[in-house]
Amino acid sequence: MLKIDKDTHRIEGVEFYDSCNRDERPFDAVIDTIIVHCISLPLGEYNNDNIIDLFLNKLDISKHKSFSDLSNLRVSSHLLIKRKGDIVQFVPFNLRAWHAGQSCYNDRENFNDFSIGIELEGTSDSKFTKEQYSSLNEVVVALKSLYANIVNENILGHSDISPGRKQDPGDLFDWSKVK
């Protein structure tokens, strides 16, 4: 069972890379939402350090032609769940990661302010692994135990809060496997 340190707002025992692509949440922000994303760099290629490098502003854009659009991008997520279920944390949960971008859902905007962003290594048109679902569920349980305002109805896809702009986690993401 995962445990989140209440002082550091980090999951104990997981790999942590300190992304500078973050800032303070608004003073009155209440964490009550989880946003599920997916990412792979390059598209459909897994088990490399490109996502980590992107979130740390260290991505070598000469490594792949598709990286040229990412040269000045400053983004992060609180977590990345790799294909084998390994969890990597980039931003403590009490801080605002830069994952949602322009967002609106149910008359709420600026989802970075009150949400936790979780990236699954994958694409919006591929299936995710049982290990990823297992780790995601462990994370959800741990987050709910620390942030009482997170409820199942507030576990959303990036496509829910940015329709027309984002497709992730995609139609093959099995929401019935998320507790």
Model-inferred region functions:
Residues M1-E109:
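N-terminal catalytic cores of peptidoglycan-degrading enzymes
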Residues M1-E12, D28, E109-F114, T123-K179:
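Basic/polar, cationic surfaces and motifs that engage anionic cell-wall
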Residues V36, I118, L136:
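Conserved, mostly hydrophobic/aromatic
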Residues C38-I39, L120, S159:
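Residues immediately flanking
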Residues D49, N112-G117:
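Hydrophobic transmembrane alpha-helix bundles
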